[in-house]
């Protein structure tokens, strides 16, 4: 705009809100139906069939809560529980090196107040394991009774994934449990 022989930028006289309203923005957009939204929200990750492609190793197992009920979607979904107190280790050893892009852990305790710590590691054949995450969570029967951790990872040629559980950081050393462990 020209005023009194001077070139003046019109935007200098507009408030930031007015500037946004006058900008010529061309956003690409597509109108979608409610049915397509509902079907996409029901999308579920294609989890690995760990029973078919790996061996599970555990330091302890309550016969009523076997590791396969935490690692697979088949049968009862009671999760895994240790038969002994104290730190426990669960390993998933793949038959062949496998790429992973997602790891999901679910823990649940509605009965005991405790602070749990877990360490999740992975390794390639012949190499030392590498830490993915170490985390603590406090369970409380009247508050936080479940923990869900969903990790996006970029891991190639994975031979082993290991979960180390300290079920209770207090001296009592509670019983470790795992509701579900999925990988994709």
Please place each PLM-identified region on the residue numbering:
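Extracellular carbohydrate recognition and processing domains
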Residues: 130-153
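Disordered, acidic Ser/Thr/Pro-rich linker "stalks" and the adjacent N-terminal cap
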Residues: 23-95, 108-112
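A short beta-strand element within beta-rich, extracytoplasmic domains
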Residues: 98-110, 163
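Short, surface-exposed beta-strand/strand-loop-strand elements in extracellular ectodomains
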Residues: 113-126
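Short beta-strand-plus-loop segments that form exposed binding edges in beta-rich domains
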Residues: 163-172
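A cross-taxa feature marking solvent-exposed loop/turn segments within ectodomains of secreted
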Residues: 98, 113-115, 156, 171
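N-terminal amphipathic/basic-hydrophobic helices that include classical n-h-c signal peptides
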Residues: 1-26
């Amino acid at each position: 705009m020209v005023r009194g022989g001077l070139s003046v930028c019109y935007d200098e006289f507009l408030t930031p809100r007015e500037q946004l309203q006058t900008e010529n923005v061309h956003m690409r957009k597509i109108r979608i139906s409610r049915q397509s939204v509902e079907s996409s929200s029901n999308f579920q990750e294609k989890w690995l069939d760990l029973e078919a492609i790996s061996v599970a190793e555990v330091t302890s197992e309550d016969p009523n809560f076997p590791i396969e009920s935490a690692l697979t979607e088949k049968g009862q979904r009671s999760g895994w529980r240790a038969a002994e107190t104290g730190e426990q280790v669960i390993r998933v050893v793949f038959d062949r090196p496998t790429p992973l892009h997602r790891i999901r852990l679910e823990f649940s305790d509605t009965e005991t107040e405790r602070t749990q710590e877990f360490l999740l590691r992975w390794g390639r054949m012949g190499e030392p394991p590498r830490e993915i995450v170490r985390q603590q969570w406090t369970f409380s029967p009247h508050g936080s009774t479940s923990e869900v951790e969903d990790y996006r990872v970029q891991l190639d040629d994975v031979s082993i994934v290991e979960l180390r559980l300290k079920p209770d950081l207090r001296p009592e050393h509670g019983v470790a449990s795992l509701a579900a462990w999925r990988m994709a």
